[in-house]
Amino acid sequence: MDRLSQLPTLRITPTKKLTLTYRGKNYQGVAGDTLATALYANGIRIFSRSIKYHRPRGLYSLNGESGNCLMEVDATPNIRTEQTPLRNGMIVVPQNVIGTPEWDFMGIMDMFHWAMPAGFYYKIFHKPYWLWPFFMGIIRKAAGIGRINPSRREGRSDELYLNCEVCVVGGGPAGISAALTAAGKGLRVILLEARPWLGGFYDYRTIEYTKGVPLYKRAVQLVEQVEDTPDVRIFPHTSLIGFYNNNLITARQKGHEKDSFDERYIEIRAQSVVVATGCTERPLIFENNERPGVMQIGCAHRLAQTYGLLPGKYAVFSVGHDLGLEAAIDLSGLGLNVLCVADSRSDGQDPELLEKLTKINIPVLKGWVASKAHGKKHIKKVTLSAIEGTKHKDFLCDLLVASTGLTNARSPIFLTQAKMVHDPDSGLFVPKKLPNKVYVAGRFLGFHDPLSIETSGELAGLAAAIDCGVSAKSQAKEVKRRLEDMPGPIRASQFTRIPGRGAHDFICFDEDVTIQHIHQAYEMGFDNAELAKRFTAAGTGPTQGGISGHNLPLVISQYNADSDGSIVPTTVRPPLTPTLLGTYAGRNPNPYKQTPLHETQKNSGAVFHRMGVWKRARYFSKDYSARDEIENVRNNVGLIDVSTLGKFRVFGPDSVKALERVYVGDMSSIPEGKVKYSAMCNDDGCLIDDGVITRRGVNDYYLTTSTGRSGVTVEWIRYHTRYDGWDFHIVNLTEVYGAINLAGPRAREVFQKITDTNLSNEAFPFMGYREFTLKDTVPVRVMRLGFVGELSYEIHIPASYTQTVWEWLLGAGEEFGICPFGLEAQNALRLEKGHVIIGQESEIRTTLHDLGLGFLLYRKKHEANTVGVFALKNTEYQQGRLKLVGFKMDSPLKTPHDGSVVVDSEIRGYICTARYSYTLGESIGLALVESHLAKKGTQLEIFDAGAGNKRLYAKVVSTSFYDAEGKRLRM
């Protein structure tokens, strides 16, 4: 399509070509285009198919009030293409079609519209009940518009938190005037505008502002002034998300191509707020009013003046306000063949505009409206009808510009809990009373005259400044007096539609809701707009009432024969603008801690996994089954990085008392050179951590905790000893020391090669602790433990030497087949041994007794007041608690997923960990089950989502599946 390239109002650069891919085919647009205008320029007229009937939908508005132009863009679904700037290389895919938008197989649904009356989904499909799962699957597949694309790249998000004296919402003439006025009083002002540029509805209009100055030039003047005002911070392409108490505003800004973000979340705390969001158009309701080729006045006008695209060749206008007459004159002058202008008003038109239409031979039919658009995929003919009488006229055309009135963009004010009432003169919903320090201005109040619009903005800016402590009451009175002498709000048409059957007269494009549906709902008793909205789903689609928000209350009021005062709009809730969850999350720098061995493991092919604040090696194998790692530890020797374990030194005269307070075991009996396994509980006796403690000297202890508790252990101990006045100190050494667990039957042989210390079973037994040096150089602290069920040495090394020791061990173990192993292998190995992991075999209600760890409780330390001991004693024999059991699957190759539930007629427990054991050749696991199922030999019935309706079966066994006597730990 040829562009109108010489217009002074253009926002495009016709010489700068950009490419996009649509349905696998390359198209060209130009810089400044939106995706929708670029596609329109390339002859695309059907942009989508409707959600229920799969009717063709085309470009209708450029403001995002309808879901007609939702598409998948660069793997992101539900993008409003009419508001999305074109960027080079964009990949666009249509949504909600089987086939193509032009030939959609599901278009057959339109033939069965009679079978889908209002609320049909509430009344069928649930009887007989056993058919519901079948229908549910079909409905879920059919529902929705866009689909999540797993290949979508992660978006770039940002966040900004601001405060100001005055926040102005809306960058049109009223908003700019308010911002300039407030800034002129020395206040900091933030100006938000949804479009990529300022100017509002002045921006594309050529009608005169004053003699010799068209409106678009006045827009340029205002924009230059506000951009040159240092106290005004402007955020273009920024849409409101929410408006909350005490003037807290949230917004979403779309990033420019050169910005470092795709979307930015903005939160603003303002002393005063001015809302100058202007008006949108109220759709005319008639048969096939959503066919491609039907569009709003502003859409047709801006296509030409802003993007250089004539919206059609032969056009008919059906309007209800003077902007429609103005657009018809303007577009006719640009080359559009305007066949006729139908105006729903019988009088009240601007005589100057009527005279211009007469001069250019465009007939005007007063008291007429469009009653039907003809054509299956695009309009080919329009029928106009007299509102009073039975006269009809047909016009062959490819464009119908239709709008019956204006409605203010009231959603931001609605969120402030302001009571909105219907004004019968302006036809708008206006606030009866505004919250403190909130003001409205401009077309929002129904002003149409440019000077009135700007003056109302000036008045709102002064009122906001006065709220901020500025002395300007006398000036505000003068401005108010001037405004009263200017043209006030114009009288608007209340017309919605010509009475008829209404089967294809759409009131809500998003949800395929027709006038017939609204009437059906009304007859069933849903006799107010809010109830009708819920029952028919009108206004609940992607645009949340954008198209239907004003007409629905008017239609219901007509059924009720209500007076204007009882016309109530439907509720508006945030977010006002669809916003990615990633945008709410803000920047995603993904901060994490890494161990001293991170790069070394990375170079060895480790696949990492986020564990709390750390990144740890999940596996080194070809897949996460880690079979080779498991078998190597069982048969030879392996090493794992355990630097993330919490490491603490507790020392001082009262250190034992402090440890006794938080650990359930007897801390006073720990000898030097030995380690003790113990646990911490909360006040309810529920397990929160486990670890080992050793005594290094008199009143000097070294202890380890789980990775998850390493960051809070100091605070936990301090909190529970805060009133005792004890003399002790605690030092967090977690990041001071790295740690390596060397495990396997050949571990002693490997370790002995890098130290002269005697590592024999007699000199360094199981659960022993030693401090010595490696190669006479590196001091280490070593514990002989057995978490994975093999001979193991947990080596704690000064962090800067950890990589060196890792390399020494790999070198020393080369002849024994040493290999690193990760968390997946460790998880399987410890499961075979029956060792628990806090948070995996436990949850917040799980006690020591539930896990079979009651032996850790030392019952004779009466004066220690240990956290959780009282609860542990009282719950030891409590009925109805879940108990930890081991189980083996009846079918060795069937392994339930973690989190699967144990059932009979009800849920009786859940699977904590289950794996296929390559060591044992069968599937094993640990589960928490009700006590009557905890006896060995009991059969468990398991529901696993991956098994469908089939049940899996297992038998309860000991929790120790491998080396129950512990011989391999002590070898």
Predicted ranges, named:
Residues 2-590, 736:
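Residues forming the flavin
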Residues 22, 73, 611, 683, ...:
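Structural motif
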Residues 25-27, 78-79, 266-268, 393-395, ...:
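Short beta-strand segments
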Residues 35-47, 648, 653-670, 749, ...:
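A short, contiguous, amphipathic alpha-helix enriched in charged residues
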Residues 279, 526, 627-643, 687-700, ...:
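Residues forming anionic-ligand binding surfaces in small-molecule and nucleic-acid pockets
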Residues 425, 490-493, 628-635, 680-690, ...:
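Short amphipathic beta-strand starts and helix->beta connectors
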Residues 532-535, 551, 558-681, 686:
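Acidic, proline/glycine-enriched N-terminal capping motif
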Residues 598, 602-603, 616, 697-971:
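Conserved, structured C-terminal
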